[in-house]
Amino acid sequence: MKNKEYIDIVGAKAHNLKNASLSIPRNQFVVVTGLSGSGKSSLAFDTIYAEGQRRYMDTLSTYAKHFMGILEKPDVESITGLSPIIAIEQKTTGNNPRSTVGTITEIYDFLRLLYARASIAYSPQTGKEMVRYSDEQIVSLIMENYAGRKCYLMAPIVRGRKGHYKELLEQMRKRGYTQMRIDGQLCELNEIDALDRYKAHFIELVVDRLKPSLKDEKRIKDSVMSALNLGKGSVAIMDMETEEVHHYSKHLVCPDTGLSLAEPAPHSFSFNSPQGYCPHCKGLGMIVNIDVDTIIPDRSVSIADGGIVPLGKIRETRKFDIIRSIARKYGISLYDPIEELPDEVISLIIFGSDELFRVGEGTSSEMVSFPGIVGDINEKIVCPVCGGTRLNKETTYFKIDGKTISEVAAMEITQLSEWLHSLDGVFAKRESLIARDILKELKDRVGFLLDVGLDYLSLDRATASLSGGESQRIRLATQIGSKLVNVLYILDEPSIGLHQRDNRKLIASLKKLRDEGNSVMVVEHDAETMMAADWLVDVGPGAGNDGGHICLSAPLDVLLGDCRSESATTGTELPADAEASVDPQSGLYSARRSICREDADKMIVGHSATLDYLTGRKAIEAPTRRRKGNGQTLGIRGARGNNLKSVDVDFPLGMLIGIAGVSGSGKSSIINETLMPVLKNRFYNAKLQPLPYDEIVGIENIDKLIEIDQSPIGRTPRSNPATFTGVFNDIRNLFEATPDAKIRGYKAGRFSFNVPGGRCEECKGAGIKVIEMNFLPSVNVVCNECRGRRYKSDTLAVKYKGKNINDVLEMPISEAYEFFETIPSIAQKLKALVDVGLGYVRLGQSAVTLSGGESQRMKLAAELAKKGTGNTLYILDEPTTGLHFDDIKVLLGVMQQLVDQGNTVIVIEHNLDILKSVDYIFDMGPEGGKAGGLIVAEGTPEQLSSNPDSVTGPFLAEVL
């Protein structure tokens, strides 16, 4: 690792970082790890990436900054050695219904180019290959095919259009032509005055009568050129004896019928272009299914009383402001029964109109159109015209190797890769030259998707249906395909959603990025990824206020005591003083000075919980016994949605159950999209549409369903652990009961920061104010009035055990638990938060600052604090996302506690520490996509580890 350059970070203080300084090598594969909430993302994204983005923004003009905004300078003293940065995060790729895997990877763009340049057109009428010829080829073919035969040379001048064509007939007579073939009949021009104007006609003008021979070649050539000119590039030849007609054209034409097609262009195959999209669904593949009787079930009810169901009852909203304007313009009352209103008005409200209506009064009024309520109706069906392909019918006439572009886009990536490689011998010589470079680009990009474990996806898969992990790996594959160099890539847990089998491909892809001359920094908890790193950074030692320090920053081989070095790998003999030594206090292998002297001053080596797990000094132990369950089951019969193949499954209750399998094998389909919607509809009167299935059995054996995901506990900065757990109500009641509050007449509402009264009205109880700045980003500043304390001074004068309400909100949860230990209603809920490892989070910390793992554990704690019935089914989907080994140990403890209370926990997971700790596993596969959808193995972890049909079994065997 000689002569490396470094990114030097000095004094990083974003969020909980404690003046962190470190050096990270460039052009290396670096993993940043640490507990959930330790400051990993603060270092990687809020410091390094934010500074890189800010420097890029600084290069833009003031005018551009006005539209793009400016990133605030991160809280860091200095960063040097920074390259241009690309961050690839876990977020989904948005909800644009036109966006697909093919469009965001640009693979579909290359596919469109391939079809435009190298596809073969087939006649929709005869199924024969359509042809195109040059002028010389047409003359040669006529000379060859009709030698010595009497024939008519004709120019098609009208193709299937209505009209009397009186002027056209007269014009042709004046130009000296005497015959036409009209609708298949040969006619003399001087005998026809006009045609039936309401009938579609096919008119071919007889340009010459021929009997091709070599001596007449010049005349034939002149006649053909004249016919091509009149027929806009097409001619027809009719044998006088057999009356057989054959068509020749410089454009694509059916040789039997003369049907011609426009030359294909890339936009002809685009569902985002009018030239390519299905005219019925406009390229969306789906249409809104509108049943007016469902929208208006009772026409005797007025609009104001909720007669139009999606609108609800009349209220003060923008939508109803426009509807009131419509009512004024058409002179109707919204309080009259709908059956008495004009149909045109009801149609306008449902379907919308371009008509403008005045909304508002005086100078604030404006003219607006109404889009209708169609957009509020979510029931959509596959477009009956294009069958969900998004493309118009014309695209189906063009094929490569017998496949249309829609059929290719529907292939899984593995099939697509095989098909592309099979095309090498398919193209003719000319097409082969055209397709060569396009095919190379397609093969490369499809190969990158295979490398990141996305073999089960298809190009026509909507991006809105992708998980965050899938979206991130698609962006990673796209970046590998871009072949950029000297870039710093920062990735956020790319292993999410990946089976161990695919994770190794992902690591190889990350190293490929590095080997092309880039720096790769990955925020990750996956042990296999860490062990593959060149350099490891561990942020900690704890989380929240206990984190923010750099515990480790050093080459992995040094940390693990592996003596490999630049000199060792080149065969140089190691000096005698290069023996590894172990620090008896930290247990860490110390660096060999003679080998790593150039890196020694860049390293930080302290105590690290992460390294304890990597070296085996600490481990998450598998349970010594597996539960047998309570003898009852919850079963699904005939589950067949997505790729599920009529699956029958019985989940044993009273157990911790793992759902394993490769990505795309059907785990989410059977749990999240079949079982969960059925149970939500049953227990909570939801109106969800599960995937197809035959029946659910044993539903009477549970009485509640709880889904615990990683979504935020609140969507606004005002949500916090105190409000989420409900302890804030109890705390405010305590303050109301204090002597000071009673003397002042303060009720519990006085101590709320969400309503007027006791809160600071300058900042509305937020403690901060947002300052809007022209040409600069908005700035959050501490409120001058309350100095960030949220409340008025007289509210803060009321104290409980020496603390005011703001002091309580600023306490870490562990401190708050001790403070309220004698109040059971508060202590019980806070203890649950401490038990799940959230003692470091402040009681009043904004929900939007909590990580996904913290939010999930908060929800688990809320469940632990409740008095359950013991018959609850808990479902968790990849709960280890964002969790360190220590966090996973805590999470496992909570899940085991829930099962010990008699409940059932189903967890969809790839993490082996979780899977080896469950009581029973269902392994899905054998592959992803169409090759999946089956339960290939089930049983205890020990049974799976020895089951040859299990894909997960061999990996379990390594850890059991």
State where each predicted segment sits.
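Conserved phosphate-binding elements of NTP-dependent enzyme cores
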Residues: M1-L960
